[in-house]
């Protein structure tokens, strides 16, 4: 079956573009900006050398002469992670790759560790798993440890409170990434 541009694809078929957003940055020419002109380019955060080449091309096309200074004025696709306007392209591309691999969970970890990418990466060594809730994690951990809970007491255990106490005591970190979707990390 050949689809013409006017014929919509049947439901359930994958014929459209990948809707996953590639992290990108808007790099502005500071000489133009300081003279009241907006001149810049949206650049995919892929490889630092490619980003720098595109920045050089953008600066060469600037309406101001002899431009060499730039700044990151906007960004998208970083799932809420923050970028400095003078972040190195190595940092930008490394963060983009990390978020590409881990999605919003990666961005949440990056923010949790004060924008330290190495600490966010290291946190995955202490990943305990994905659960419907932190209470489910606390219950599974308790039951898997061999603790016998009599059936008559089972309904009296507040798994939510236990999970909250584990988080407040610094034993675990809990990140919610969706409805009934939490990720637990040990805080060792």
Q: Where does each model-flagged region fall?
A:
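N-terminal ordered "arm"
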Residues: 2-61
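Non-transmembrane, interaction-prone alpha-helical and coil segments associated with secretion
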Residues: 3, 8, 76-79, 83-87, ...
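Ordered hydrophobic segments in well-structured contexts
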Residues: 23-28, 39-44, 69-73, 171-176, ...
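Residue-level signal for secondary-structure boundary elements
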Residues: 35, 63-67, 104-107, 146-150, ...
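Structured domain cores in non-transmembrane regions
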Residues: 49-118
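Phosphate/anion-contacting hairpin/loop surfaces
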Residues: 109-110, 117-145
């Amino acid at each position: 079956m050949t689809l013409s541009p006017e014929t919509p694809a049947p439901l359930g078929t994958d014929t459209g573009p990948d809707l996953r957003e590639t992290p990108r940055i808007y790099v502005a020419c500071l000489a133009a900006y300081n003279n009241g002109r907006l001149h810049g380019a949206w650049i995919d955060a892929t490889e630092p050398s490619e980003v720098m080449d595109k920045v050089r091309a953008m600066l060469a096309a600037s309406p101001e002469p002899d431009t060499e200074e730039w700044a990151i004025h906007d960004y998208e696709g970083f799932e809420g992670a923050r970028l400095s306007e003078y972040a190195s392209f190595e940092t930008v591309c490394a963060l983009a790759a990390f978020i590409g691999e881990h999605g919003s969970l990666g961005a949440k970890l990056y923010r949790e560790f004060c924008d330290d990418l190495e600490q966010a990466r290291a946190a995955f060594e202490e990943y305990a798993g994905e659960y419907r809730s932190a209470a489910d994690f606390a219950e599974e951990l308790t039951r898997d440890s061999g603790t016998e809970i009599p059936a008559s007491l089972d309904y009296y255990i507040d798994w939510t409170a236990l999970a909250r106490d584990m988080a407040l005591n610094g034993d675990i970190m809990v990140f919610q990434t969706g409805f009934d979707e939490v990720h637990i990390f040990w805080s060792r």
